[in-house]
């Protein structure tokens, strides 16, 4: 607990992100990763391998932008740093491990940025409703971006803002995911997407109890490799059930088969 509290206090975090609970969530993930390291290992390696395949898809290798690089457990940073002239690790909060890794690599830069580009407006009530959420724009005009990686964030974008708005007014937010998908399609370089599709609730005997969409009504319109992530093994959240995510990895959306 002392280490968690210290990590929370010393990790740089914009005020809006701290208000929404991003620092607290980052510390929680660090702790859960420590407890569930073995269960998470296949998912993390699968994610890294998808990014490695995306690197091979990029004909030019000037700049890579990684969206959702806050902890880096699922990121083959050494491969990216070796392959590209510059690596931009984009997130609202960057954990101690990824900060140290960036410091060790001269061509790796941390970029503190809200990838939805709407959190401030949502929290301050400047958006009438989810349908008025602005489309993200950052990095779109940069011709040197040869690879974009959306790293296990598509299902997470509405989570903390949605919780905040539900606490404030009973509202719900899910449009961030759809806006993020549209944003990715506007890049001219290779775009790699890794993200949760479904959340499965399993009984203690392993039987499936319920399957829930992880995307809050949005969809990922591309086919790719899928696998299961044992995000909360039996006993992690409750002694009577486990939680497992179905994840998709798409090295290049332009080369992937589109799905309805």
Map each language-model feature to its residues.
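Charged, low-complexity C-terminal accessory regions
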Residues: 196-260
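Conserved beta-strand signature within the Rossmann-like core of class I S-adenosyl-L-methionine
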Residues: 147-150, 176-183, 188-196
């Amino acid at each position: 607990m002392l280490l968690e509290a210290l990590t929370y206090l010393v990790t740089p975090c914009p005020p809006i992100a701290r208000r929404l609970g991003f620092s607290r969530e980052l510390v929680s993930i660090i702790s859960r990763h420590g407890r569930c390291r073995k269960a998470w290992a296949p998912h993390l390696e699968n994610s890294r391998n998808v990014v490695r395949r995306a690197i091979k898809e990029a004909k030019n290798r000037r700049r890579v932008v990684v969206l959702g690089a806050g902890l880096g457990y699922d990121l083959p940073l050494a491969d990216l740093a070796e392959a590209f002239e510059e690596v931009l690790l984009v997130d609202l909060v960057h954990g101690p491990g990824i900060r140290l890794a960036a410091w060790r690599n001269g061509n790796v830069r941390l970029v503190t940025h809200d990838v939805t580009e709407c959190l401030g407006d949502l929290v301050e009530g400047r958006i009438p409703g989810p349908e008025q959420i602005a489309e993200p724009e950052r990095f779109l005009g940069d011709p040197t971006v040869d690879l974009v990686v959306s790293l296990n964030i598509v299902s997470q974008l509405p989570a903390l803002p949605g919780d905040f708005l539900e606490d404030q007014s009973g509202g719900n937010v899910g449009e961030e995911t759809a806006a993020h998908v549209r944003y990715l399609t506007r890049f001219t370089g290779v775009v790699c997407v890794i993200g949760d599709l479904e959340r499965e609730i399993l009984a203690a005997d392993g039987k499936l109890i319920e399957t829930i969409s992880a995307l809050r009504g949005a969809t990922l319109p591309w086919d790719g490799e899928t696998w299961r992530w044992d995000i909360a093994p039996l006993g992690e959240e409750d002694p009577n059930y486990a939680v497992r995510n179905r994840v998709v990895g798409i090295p290049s959306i332009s080369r992937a088969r589109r799905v309805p």
